[in-house]
């Protein structure tokens, strides 16, 4: 069985992964058929690059992505795009849907960032209040 999975590279505590197509019986960092992308989890935000046409080709041939790679592919919007192609949508419809999807993703990221900032601010205020009450 052919899998689309991660191959670790980089140095100690600084991982960089290649997204590869490999036989499921080969070791994690062993023999592979093709490199179809890269993933850098240490960057903020994470960097994911995919050769979308090659991932689509291999998935069409029956390659199964692992759970982690599946979530990475989903994060790039490729699964959504492939689903629309499978449903028979036109290229123009797919392009407009992908623009909407990207806008929604950006809105989600912005919302997540603002929520984190609010939580940090509230936590600092609570710590300051507890410190001032402990002093007095």
From Swiss-Prot:
Coiled coil: none
Key words, A-Z: Ribonucleoprotein, Ribosomal protein
Region span, Disordered: 114-136
Family classification: Belongs to the bacterial ribosomal protein bS16 family.
Biased composition (Basic residues): 114-123
InterPro entries per UniProt: Ribosomal_bS16, Ribosomal_bS16_CS, Ribosomal_bS16_dom_sf
One MF term in the entry's GO annotations: structural constituent of ribosome
Source organism superkingdom: Bacteria
UniProt keyword Ubl conjugation present: no
HAMAP family attached to this UniProt entry: Ribosomal_bS16 (MF_00385)
Protein name: Small ribosomal subunit protein bS16
GO CC, alphabetical: cytoplasm; small ribosomal subunit
Gene3D superfamilies: 3.30.1320.10
GO BP annotation list: translation
Transmembrane portions of the chain: none
A Pfam family reported for this protein in Swiss-Prot or TrEMBL: Ribosomal_S16
The UniProt record lists the keyword Amino-acid biosynthesis: no
């Amino acid at each position: 069985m052919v899998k689309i999975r991660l191959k670790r590279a980089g140095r100690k505590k600084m991982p960089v992964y290649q997204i590869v197509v490999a036989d499921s019986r080969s070791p994690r960092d062993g023999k592979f058929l093709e490199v179809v992308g890269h993933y850098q989890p240490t960057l903020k935000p994470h960097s994911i690059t995919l050769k979308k046409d090659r991932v689509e080709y291999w998935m069409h041939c029956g390659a199964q992505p692992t759970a982690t790679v599946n979530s990475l592919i989903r994060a790039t919007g490729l699964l959504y795009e492939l689903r629309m192609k499978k449903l028979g949508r036109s290229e123009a419809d797919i392009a407009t849907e992908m623009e909407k999807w990207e806008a929604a993703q950006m809105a989600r990221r912005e919302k997540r960032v603002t929520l984190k900032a609010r939580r940090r601010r509230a936590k600092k205020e609570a710590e300051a209040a507890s410190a001032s009450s402990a002093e007095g």
